[in-house]
Curated annotation (Swiss-Prot):
Protein name: Ubiquitin thioesterase OTU1
High-level lineage: Eukaryota, Metazoa, Chordata, Craniata, Vertebrata
Domain of life per record: Eukaryota
Organism: Bos taurus (Bovine)
Region (Cys-loop): 154-160
Region (UBX-like), start-end ranges: 50-128
Coiled-coil ranges from the UniProt annotation: none
Residue numbers spanned by region Variable-loop: 213-223
Zinc finger (C2H2-type) boundaries: 318-342
């Protein structure tokens, strides 16, 4: 889990005059807002650890002195493919094996520190497969299940984007109640830089946008994602199930962390890596150098597309829930909202 540069999580207001900025999909962003202080007393510095395995050396992300052994093992499993139960982790010179028997042990209680290189080996004394028995009584072997990238369903309550972003950047915390504060934070950032966040960017005046985004019946999109990418200092990748493409916010900003969302035309869900061991928490934060997870995300989107699990925003049928007028597509809904001020739509 990690917080934004210059501070922690939502719950404080950025200092006046903090720089704004927004990127379009696949475009870079500027540095994030400054002057934000940590919330809840979080002062744990992030650790920089490297792990050396058979296939090469990797940087481990999002760890601190309070990270549990099970979380460390989960990240190593995602990188190396070695399940937590088969891992041997050595450190120091001569290398000594870490005690991994208690998954709740925190890293500061182990003989390691930030900057260390961890040597990861597969324990050859443990079977790579699980024995099973055929009807003839002879043992057969089932191949070990690998971690799977999956969609985490969040409520379809007009705030799915905010709930999804919060889930991934907080390391798997589902908290729909986060949305109002995130909306207010975004409004503050936009209001602080009216020159950049102009009507040409926002599609409405700066003041109108700030009032609009704070309402709980409005949807977030590219502008809000770009602001959150800078605030959390991470690349936010949105995989589209209709076009099977990935829009990468903060791609050129040099962030070391990456999180993923999936979008079906009207709804966002977070993506996380789920491990076979139910005691291993899902992984939501990835290295920005890990392109394998992007391939997995595209495969997930393509699978959803083949099952028609998307909404064509240019052709779907809507009804205005205020005046009951029938509308087709996002453009008609947008025009209707401008003409009437009605913004509560339902899909027919």
């Amino acid at each position: 889990m990690f917080g934004p540069a210059k501070g922690g999580h939502f719950g404080v207001h950025p200092a006046a005059g903090c720089p704004g900025g927004v990127s379009q999909p696949a475009a870079g962003t500027k540095a994030g807002p400054a002057g934000v202080c940590p919330v809840g007393g979080r002062t744990n510095a992030m650790w920089r650890l490297r792990c050396k395995a058979k296939e090469g050396t990797h940087v481990l992300q999002g760890l601190s002195s309070r990270t549990r052994v099970r979380e460390l093992q989960g990240q190593i499993a995602a990188i190396t493919g070695i399940s937590p139960g088969c891992q041997r982790i050595l450190v120091g010179y001569p290398p000594e094996c870490l005690d991994l028997s208690n998954g709740d042990t925190i890293l500061e209680d182990l003989p390691i520190q930030s900057g260390d290189m961890l040597i990861v080996e597969e324990d050859q004394n443990r079977p790579k497969t699980s024995p099973a028995f055929t009807k003839y009584g002879a043992p057969s072997y089932v191949r070990e299940t690998l971690p799977v990238l999956a969609r985490m369903a969040v409520p379809a309550d007009n705030s799915c984007l905010f709930t999804s972003v919060y889930y991934v950047v907080e390391g798997g915390v589902l908290n729909p109640a986060c949305a109002p504060e995130m909306r207010r934070f975004i409004a503050q950032i936009v209001a602080s830089d009216p020159d950049f966040y102009s009507e040409a960017i926002l599609g409405k005046t700066n003041e109108e946008y700030c009032d609009w985004i704070k309402r709980d019946d409005t949807w977030g999109g590219a502008i809000e994602i770009s602001i959150l990418s800078k605030f959390y200092q991470c690349e936010i990748c949105v995989v589209d199930t209709q076009t099977v493409r990935i829009d990468r916010f903060g791609e050129d900003a040099g962030y070391t962390k990456r999180v993923l969302l999936i979008y079906d035309g009207i709804h966002y869900d977070p993506l996380h890596l789920v491990f076979p061991d139910p005691d291993t928490p899902p992984l939501t934060i990835f290295s920005s150098y890990d392109d394998i997870v992007l391939v997995q995300a595209l495969e997930l989107a393509d699978e959803a597309r083949k099952k028609r699990q998307f909404t064509d925003v240019n052709r779907f049928t809507l009804r205005c829930m205020v005046c009951q007028k029938g509308l087709t597509g996002q453009a008609e809904a947008r025009d209707h909202a401008k003409e009437t001020g009605h913004t509560n739509f339902g899909e027919v």
